Regions:
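RNA pseudouridine synthases
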Residues: 1-184
């Protein structure tokens, strides 16, 4: 039987599990084929690329840190992020006694054609926001949020835009598509 691999654009507020919890929608309402499970997690307040598959060995491979699968994020942060802060992110940050691995990070322009988040992030006219693109090869709980906060720029909106060689592209929130297992 052929392995099924799905790329899903997880909307804000949706859990990365099939069992709903009070106040949060889960994956069970998006019409996925039977037998698929999330290969990783994305917090309910984060958006973007989430892989699902029916192959347990593939899930294990995607989650095992020794394989260092890159994951790329766009983070909208509070304030105008500085190059020094980005350089700190690149070198790694100490969070609760753990030193993160070096990552790729760069300041980027606000993304064009980005869907609106529902609900929108807070808006304060006198405090700007900025965007940073980060590629990590590890995935600790809320790592990007902890990293940006540690350098003085808390994350307001977080979107995973790529997992390994699989970009989210123009896939809209709540939509999914089958991807080729060999590109992982």
């Amino acid at each position: 039987m052929k392995t099924v691999v799905i790329l899903f654009n997880k909307p804000y507020g949706v859990l990365s599990q099939f069992t709903p919890e009070v106040g949060h929608q889960a994956l069970d309402g998006f019409g996925f084929p039977a037998g698929v499970y999330a290969a990783g997690r994305l917090d309910h307040d984060s958006e973007g690329a989430l892989l699902l598959t029916d192959e347990g060995k593939l899930i294990k491979k995607l989650l095992d840190p020794k394989f260092e699968h890159p994951r790329t994020y766009l983070a909208q942060v509070d304030g105008q992020i500085t190059q020094e802060a980005v350089n700190q992110l690149k070198r790694g940050i100490t969070i609760k006694g753990y030193r993160t691995k070096p990552c790729q990070a760069k300041i980027v322009s606000p993304p064009e054609n980005l869907w609106e988040r529902v609900p929108p992030i807070r808006f304060r006219a006198n405090i700007p926001t900025s965007w940073v693109n980060l590629t990590l090869i590890e995935g600790k709980n809320r790592q990007v949020r902890h990293m940006t906060a540690a350098v003085g720029f808390p994350t307001l909106r977080l979107i995973r835009i790529q997992i390994g060689n699989i970009p989210l592209g123009d896939l809209l929130p709540g939509k999914w598509r089958i991807v080729n297992e060999r590109v992982i």
